[in-house]
């Protein structure tokens, strides 16, 4: 279980309140599919993923990215119970979708990059550290059913 300090929780929730879930979610998932093309195999029903521009403009990528970040928003509300928050999604991704749990870490890292890009100077080293901890905690929670 990941333990967040009061300061880390404040930093995470403060920035989260400014995040455009649709935009950041689509961009983070799109970046994952471009930078790590083997992850595309989990999204064969998304249509054209033949190039970076096709991926970044794909409405299904954007919609799923929004869905992913909406789930992250629930986790931010429940930072003290990430495992419980993601129990169902962990089971789904493990048992039905057979997603390599390493991909959760990769997507988390892409999200941190997107947040840094969007928030610039506001994304200080302290903010980055808190968010890295958050996405790592989420990756652990999502991988829980794999163990």
From Swiss-Prot:
Protein name in UniProt: Hemoglobin subunit gamma
GO-annotated cellular components: blood microparticle; haptoglobin-hemoglobin complex; hemoglobin complex
Record: residues binding heme b: 64, 93
Globin domain span: 3-147
SUPFAM superfamilies the record matches: Globin-like
Native source organism of the sequence: Cheirogaleus medius (Fat-tailed dwarf lemur)
Heme found in the keyword field: yes
Function: Gamma chains make up the fetal hemoglobin F, in combination with alpha chains.
Family according to the record: Belongs to the globin family.
Subunit structure as annotated in this protein's UniProt entry: Heterotetramer of two alpha chains and two gamma chains in fetal hemoglobin (Hb F).
Tissue specificity remark: Red blood cells.
CDD domains: Hb-beta-like
The keyword Flavoprotein appears for this protein: no
PROSITE patterns: GLOBIN
Tree of life domain: Eukaryota
GO molecular function, one term: organic acid binding
InterPro entries the record matches: Globin, Globin-like_sf, Globin/Proto, Hemoglobin_b, Hemoglobin_oxygen_transport
């Amino acid at each position: 279980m990941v333990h967040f300090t009061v300061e880390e929780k404040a930093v995470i929730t403060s920035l989260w309140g400014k995040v455009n879930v649709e935009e950041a979610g689509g961009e983070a998932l799109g970046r994952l599919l471009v930078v790590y093309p083997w992850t595309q195999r989990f999204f064969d029903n998304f249509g054209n993923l033949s190039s970076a521009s096709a991926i970044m403009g794909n409405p299904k990528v954007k919609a799923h990215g929004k869905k992913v970040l909406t789930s992250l928003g629930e986790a931010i509300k429940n930072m003290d119970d990430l495992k419980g928050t993601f129990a169902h999604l962990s089971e789904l991704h493990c048992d039905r979708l057979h997603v390599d749990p390493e991909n959760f870490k990769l997507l988390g890292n892409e999200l941190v990059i997107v947040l840094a890009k969007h928030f610039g100077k506001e994304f200080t080293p302290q903010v980055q550290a808190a968010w890295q901890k958050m996405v790592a905690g989420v990756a652990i929670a999502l991988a829980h059913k794999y163990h």
